[in-house]
């Protein structure tokens, strides 16, 4: 179910262009163990200009 929430918040982040939803998406993808999909919100945050070091830490 965490993977479903990850997708939900990722799509919500795309719709609203709101960083909070991308961070929530990362949390749920990590809880589900889906290390492939976690890159989707990370890439969006990178495009939005988020700090590269923070994003690298979140990718671990």
Where in the sequence are the language-model features?
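C-terminal non-catalytic interaction modules
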Residues: 1-60
């Amino acid at each position: 179910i965490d993977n479903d929430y990850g997708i939900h918040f990722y799509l919500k982040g795309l719709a609203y262009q709101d960083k909070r939803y991308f961070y929530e998406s990362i949390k749920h993808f990590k809880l589900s163990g889906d290390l492939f999909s976690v890159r989707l919100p990370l890439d969006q945050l990178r495009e939005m200009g988020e700090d590269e070091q923070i994003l690298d830490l979140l990718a671990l």
